[in-house]
């Protein structure tokens, strides 16, 4: 049985109040279905206008895998902050670990990435999440990420 939803839709305005990231390094557009079990889904609409496509790769644009991992971490940060504070409260989020990372399929301009994140552990300010990045329901990347939330 799925855990109840705490926050159904965290829009870009709430994300901007929650995370310190800004263009060009804010890599999520919204977070949906933040549940009481510290899970949720980040959404990223990939556009050809992304700055990364100027060099990755000009003749065949592919969204960089490392940016997907950062999108997972940002999604986890929003889930952690909003779950602890009950609202968007600015916090610094320090990305600490990446484990079991795999890239499965390329992500192209026009794709929408869903970052399915679920907490797999927490100790004080430290959080660990497992994430699957999906496009059209197909896993394109996966990783376990760790972060520290501070005031």
Curated annotation (Swiss-Prot):
Keywords: Cytoplasm, Lipid A biosynthesis, Lipid biosynthesis, Lipid metabolism, Lyase. It catalyses: a (3R)-hydroxyacyl-[ACP] = a (2E)-enoyl-[ACP] + H2O. It comes from the Bacteria. CDD domains: FabZ. GO terms for biological process: fatty acid biosynthetic process; lipid A biosynthetic process. Its main location: cytoplasm. It is found in: Cytoplasm. The keyword 4Fe-4S does not apply. One of its GO terms (cellular component) is membrane. SUPFAM superfamilies: Thioesterase/thiol ester dehydrase-isomerase. It is an enzyme of class 4 (lyase). GO terms for molecular function: (3R)-hydroxyacyl-[acyl-carrier-protein] dehydratase activity. Its EC number is 4.2.1.59. The active site is at 56. Belongs to the thioester dehydratase family. FabZ subfamily. NCBIfam families: fabZ, PRK00006.1. Involved in unsaturated fatty acids biosynthesis. Catalyzes the dehydration of short chain beta-hydroxyacyl-ACPs and long chain saturated and unsaturated beta-hydroxyacyl-ACPs. This is 3-hydroxyacyl-[acyl-carrier-protein] dehydratase FabZ. It comes from Rhodopseudomonas palustris (strain BisA53). The gene is fabZ.
């Amino acid at each position: 049985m799925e855990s109840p939803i705490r926050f159904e839709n965290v829009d870009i305005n709430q994300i901007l109040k929650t995370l310190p990231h800004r263009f060009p390094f804010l890599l999520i557009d919204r977070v949906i279905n933040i549940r009481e079990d510290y899970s949720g889904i980040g959404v990223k609409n990939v556009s050809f206008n992304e700055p990364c496509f100027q060099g990755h790769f000009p003749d065949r644009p592919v969204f960089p895998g490392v940016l997907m991992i950062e999108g997972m971490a940002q999604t986890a940060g929003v889930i952690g902050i909003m779950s602890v504070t009950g609202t968007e409260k600015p916090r610094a989020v320090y990305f600490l670990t990446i484990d079991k990372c795999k890239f499965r399929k390329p992500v192209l301009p026009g794709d929408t990435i869903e970052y399915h994140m679920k907490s797999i552990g927490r100790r004080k300010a430290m959080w660990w999440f497992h994430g699957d990045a999906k496009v059209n329901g197909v896993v394109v990347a996966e990783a376990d990420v760790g972060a520290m939330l501070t005031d």
